[in-house]
Amino acid sequence: KATLGASEVGLSGSGHIGEKATFLFSARQSYLQMLFKLLGLPFLPNYIDAQAKVRIRFSQRDELTVLALAGIDNMRLNTDEKGEETEYLLSYLPRLRQETFTVGASYRHYAGRHAQTVTLSHSYLNNRNTKYLGNDESSEDNLTLRLRAVEQKTSLRAENRSHLGRWTLREGVELSYSHYTNRTFRRFFAEQAGTLNYRTRLGLTGW
């Protein structure tokens, strides 16, 4: 099914894959950049996102679900616009770009009043900010900000759920690993000009 809205166009669908599997998906693409440009705004946002789900029923007791989500945000500057207020905003607003996705799989087994689930997932976020003095990208000497930050997390979880009359008992274990990196270059102008240039790398394990 295709949809057309005031700020986006979308596509979605669902159905069967053979006798044991079903699928569901949707995707959206905005055209906000065109609308914001017509309105004379100094920033032009745009996004694309999509999601998909597949469920496979191996038997009455066993099933597998796979889920994926993804998105891209991209905001660029409308340097064609003039005016004191617009030029002030353009002087400090950076260009932003962000990509993110999450993918996971969950296997579930039903055993009477009990159900066991094992889930594996991974998420990713990439954030980038860039700014040039006077929005002039013709020379790296004009670069005042370049930020690159990436966050990732991988998780493995096992769980048992038991229905005991009026009570539900749930127990489980989880292991996760998170990884973060940041590379930042910043040139600033105050009483004395200077630069800030650093890298960060961090890994965390949790359970």
Question: What is each residue range found by the language model?
Answer:
Residues R55-D73, P94-W207:
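Face-selective signature of the C-terminal outer-membrane beta-barrel domain
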Residues M34-L35, E87-Y88, E140-D141, A190:
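General secondary-structure edge motif
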Residues A21-A27, F43-L44, E63, G71-E87, ...:
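A subset of solvent-exposed loop/turn segments in beta-rich extracellular surface proteins, enriched
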Residues M34-L39, N78-D80, T130-Y132, R183-F185:
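Short acidic, glycine/proline-rich loop/turn micro-motifs
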Residues T3, L44, L96-Q98:
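Short, solvent-exposed secondary-structure boundary motifs
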Residues L90-Y92:
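Histidine-acidic residue clusters that define the catalytic metal-binding segment
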Residues K1-P42, D49-R57, T65-L69:
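Predominantly transmembrane beta-strands of Gram-negative outer membrane beta-barrel pores used
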